[in-house]
Amino acid sequence: MEKREIIKIIENCAIKYKNNLSNKNLLFVYYDKNIVKYIETKFLPSNFLHLTGIKYKRESNNNAIKFYKDILDKKVSLKNLKIVNEGIIKLKLNILNMILDINYSAKMIGEFNSNFKNLLRTEKIIGTNVYSMGFIKVGDYYIPNTTLKEDIRNITNKTNRVIAIFSKEIKEKQYSKLTYINKKTELVQIFKIKK
């Protein structure tokens, strides 16, 4: 995969990330042993670079936020991209566009099984039978730190069914938008939430 092709895919995905996830909290509601539970996630501009699998080096201001701004402004130079593992980048870029719809399409959640990949440091996995996104807890929220082209059931100790997803802007106090509800779930069930 050539760097120009990689940049084009990432530019399109950055726009989708900006529209769907950036500066938003998502609340994933799920069943665990017939008890309704949830986790709260936070998506920041600085998280986008981690989801792509690439490394970004500039002469000055080498950070994930600068990369996100540069990619949206179409100012990323080929010489500043570092491809560490082309195979991993191909896998990530094959699913990145789909996974950025996680606010509408996540079906399962589970604890990461560290026996799957010893070097991968993530805690919660949210996804489908095609893709998964990993999250680590930072403060009160889980933030995304990886994407995997992998059936969630293969990389978690146990999966739980996502029954609803709520979204809000980070600055809002309350969740204002229901983006997904499992067709077998009634709203009244969701409001019996326990942490």
Question: Which residues are covered by each model-predicted region?
Answer:
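Compact beta-sheet-dominated globular domain cores
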Residues: 128-181
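An acidic, glycine-rich, mixed-charge low-complexity segment common to nucleic-acid enzymes
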Residues: 1-120, 168-195
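Active-site metal-binding core of divalent-cation-utilizing nuclease and nuclease-like domains
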Residues: 121-128
